[in-house]
Amino acid sequence: MNLLAKTRKLNTMLQQEASTHVDFKVMADRLSEVMESNTFIVSRRGKLLGIAIKQQIENARIRGFLEERQFPEDYTKKLFNVTETTANIAIDSEHTAFPIDNRDMFETSKTTIVPIIGGGERLGTLVLGRMLEDFNEEDLVLAEYGATVVGMEILREKAHEAEDKARKKAVVQMAINSLSYSELEAIEHIFEELDGNEGLLVASKIADRVGITRSVIVNALRKLESAGVIESRSLGMKGTYIKILNDNFLYELERIKSN
C-alpha cells in the first residue's frame, strides 16, 4: 500500500470515529493499524490517552505503566523535551519506548516520537514503537499527519470541556439568583451543615436553629433540584439525603457569602 492509499485509509478511519466524544483509544488503534506499530497517545502530564499494542512487550514495569495508563514523570519530561519528530530511536536512548532492562530482547527495536501541537502549544506526544523495521519517510509523513489529527481532537475536547464548565457555572448562577433572600440564607446554612458534597440533614432542626420555616428550606431545595444542581431524597424520620451534582455550586455559594 503506497503513501496516498495509507493516508486515505487513515483519514477515512479517523473520520468514521468523529463524534462529540473523542475516543483516543480508537484513534490509537487506527494509527497502530496503518503504522503497524505500538502506538501511545500521551498527554502533557504523561497520561496515556490512547494505547494500541501491535507487538507485545513482556516486561512487568511496562505492563504496570499500561495498566495505570500513565508514563513515569521523568520519561514524560524527556518526551516533552523532544520538540520535533525524531525517528528510529535505538534501545540505548533515554527516549526509547522499550524496556532497557531487557535490552537483549529489544536490541533491534525502533522508537519514533512526534510532538502533538495544536493552537500553537504542545498538547502531548505521539510515541510509536516497532520491534524490527525502521520507520521510513512515508511512515513519518503518516505519523505527523496522525499527530496533527490527534492535536485537533485534543483541542476539540478542551473546547467541549470549557463549554461544559461555562454551562454548569451559568446554571448554578441562575439557580442561586432564583432564590429569595430567606431561601438563600437557608441554603447557606444547609450546606454548612452538610460539610461536603453529600450527606443527610434534618430540615426541621435547621429551621428551628436558624429561625426560618421548614417550607422555606423545602422550596429552596426544590429550586436547586429542578435546576439539576442537587439531588435530594426524603428518608422519612431520618431526614433528607442531599447530593451536589454540579461541582461549581459550593464555589459560587461561597463567593456570594464572601461578597
From Swiss-Prot:
Residue range(s) of DNA binding per entry: 203-222
Intrachain S-S bonds: none
Record's keyword terms, sorted: Cytoplasm, DNA-binding, Repressor, Transcription, Transcription regulation
GO cellular component, one term: cytoplasm
Cellular location(s): Cytoplasm
TM region positions: none
InterPro entries hit by this protein: CodY, GAF-like_dom_sf, GTP_trans_reg_CodY_C, Transc_reg_CodY_N, WH-like_DNA-bd_sf, WH_DNA-bd_sf
First-listed, main subcellular location of the protein, grouped into a coarse class: cytoplasm
Region annotation GAF domain: where it falls in the sequence: 1-155
Gene Ontology biological process: negative regulation of DNA-templated transcription
Molecular function GO labels: DNA binding; DNA-binding transcription factor activity; GTP binding
Function: DNA-binding global transcriptional regulator which is involved in the adaptive response to starvation and acts by directly or indirectly controlling the expression of numerous genes in response to nutrient availability. During rapid exponential growth, CodY is highly active and represses genes whose products allow adaptation to nutrient depletion.
Family: Belongs to the CodY family.
Name used for this protein in its record: Global transcriptional regulator CodY
Species this chain originates from: Exiguobacterium sibiricum (strain DSM 17290 / CCUG 55495 / CIP 109462 / JCM 13490 / 255-15)
